Amino acid sequence: MVIGSRILCNAALTKEIESKKKNPLNWGFLEWVYSSAIKEVNRIFPLIRLPNIPLRKLRSLRWEGVRTFNLGVWRKDFIAVNGFDESFQGWGHEDADLAVRLLKIGVKRKDGQFSLPVLHLWHQESSRTNEAENLRRLMARIDDKQTKASIGLNQYI
């Protein structure tokens, strides 16, 4: 699995992107610096490109920090773990659960920071009311042998 990074857009910039008034994909360096200075985006460091060096595999067995906003995984591996576990409700920890199960079947992590940035458009966050239960579910998953999602992809295919 390859984990990239993201640049968060604020609500105003998101609205301008959606209405096609702004297109950050065509921006030069100074436009990005300005956008960061006026807080339209949270950071610009992910735009820096670094070569494909061995450091990208340093955390190959770690699930911590894996977020699925910018994750690449082979289809066969995603199917092998039955995709996302839909027993996770609301916000939190479903991406870490997916990473844990992928690692359990032998998939290695490769960091794509400074290589694969994405723009993350602003949106309302999901409810965090079930975060504690989702965290408990994740901690149990780390300790068990289960590699397939309880409620997952197989219900759709």
Residue ranges and their predicted role:
Residues 61-64, 86-88, 154:
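Active-site rim elements
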Residues 129-153:
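Catalytic core of nucleotide-sugar-dependent glycosyltransferases
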Residues 35-72:
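A recurrent flexible, glycine/aromatic-enriched loop bordering the glycosyltransferase active site
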Residues 1, 70-72, 118:
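Conserved hydrophobic/aromatic beta-strand scaffold that supports enzyme active sites
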Residues 13-18, 124, 130-133:
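Short aromatic-enriched loop/helix-cap "lid" or pocket-rim segments at secondary-structure transitions
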Residues 1-36:
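Conserved donor NDP-sugar-binding/catalytic core segment of glycosyltransferases
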Residues 65-82, 89-108, 113:
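A short, conserved alpha-helix in the catalytic core of glycosyltransferases
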Residues 9, 112-129:
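Active-site donor/metal-binding and catalytic loop motifs
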